[in-house]
Amino acid sequence: TSKEMEIKLTNVARASLEELMNDYKDFLRIRNLTIWDKKHRYYSQLTKILTAKDATYETYRKGIESPDPEVSANVMIGLINITTYLLAKQIKTMEKEFLQEGGLREKMSQARMDVRRNQK
């Protein structure tokens, strides 16, 4: 795929995750459950788990599969927050590379011009 398409598709993925996060928040609101903020008693514990190095599904299993819907929804919100943050960083890097290196069409045009120049 072209750099342009990679950027577009990554943006679509980020936007889809943000919609999913809003769905989790709506789920909590409709059920009068709490969306955890920094003041919530579980917030620091959740942050510690979410920022664990070399995390796997097992790292989050207890929270995701919790029988308490408030816990599982807030864990998912946290995971989505981290994922969208990382995708935003990736998009910035991809855009920077695109500006510096150009896209596929530009590279193909440059290659054609180089061939023409060398033929003369």
Segments predicted by a language model, with ranges:
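Amphipathic alpha-helical assembly/interaction segments
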Residues: 1-120
